[in-house]
């Protein structure tokens, strides 16, 4: 008999709300009797934008802006139907992107 697994990948710009969402998912899965692996922190993706400070000249004067994308991975092993239902009803913050693979 093959083991069933749900892989949940979370992304957010703020690590605090990301960790809170991961804790909610882990708590829900444990409460319904499923096995948990994670949350596993994945590498943080940094995107840097460099722009000129002045509108026309002075190319040596530049400003850099950075955007960080934090990621977490959670594996739910042998989920029950109750686990899937409770994960669907879970209310998570709007700043968290959720990717689910079965």
Swiss-Prot record:
Pfam families in the cross-refs: Ribosomal_S10
SMART domains reported for this sequence: Ribosomal_S10
InterPro entries given in the database record: Ribosomal_uS10, Ribosomal_uS10_CS, Ribosomal_uS10_dom, Ribosomal_uS10_dom_sf
GO BP annotations listed: translation
Record keyword Ribosomal protein present: yes
GO cellular component: a single term: ribonucleoprotein complex
GO MF term (any one): structural constituent of ribosome
Keywords from the UniProt entry: Ribonucleoprotein, Ribosomal protein
Subunit text: Part of the 30S ribosomal subunit.
Family under the similarity heading: Belongs to the universal ribosomal protein uS10 family.
HAMAP family hit by this protein: Ribosomal_uS10 (MF_00508)
Functional summary from the UniProt entry: Involved in the binding of tRNA to the ribosomes.
Name this polypeptide is given: Small ribosomal subunit protein uS10
Originating organism: Levilactobacillus brevis (strain ATCC 367 / BCRC 12310 / CIP 105137 / JCM 1170 / LMG 11437 / NCIMB 947 / NCTC 947)
């Amino acid at each position: 008999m093959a083991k069933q697994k749900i892989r949940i990948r979370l992304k957010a710009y703020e690590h605090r709300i990301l960790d809170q969402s991961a804790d909610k998912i882990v708590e829900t899965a444990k409460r319904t009797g499923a096995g948990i692996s994670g949350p596993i922190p994945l590498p943080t993706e940094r995107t840097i934008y460099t722009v000129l400070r002045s509108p026309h000249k002075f190319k040596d004067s530049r400003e850099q802006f950075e955007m960080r994308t934090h990621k977490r991975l959670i594996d739910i092993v042998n989920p029950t139907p109750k686990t899937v239902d409770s994960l669907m009803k879970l209310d998570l913050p709007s700043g968290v992107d959720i990717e689910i693979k079965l």
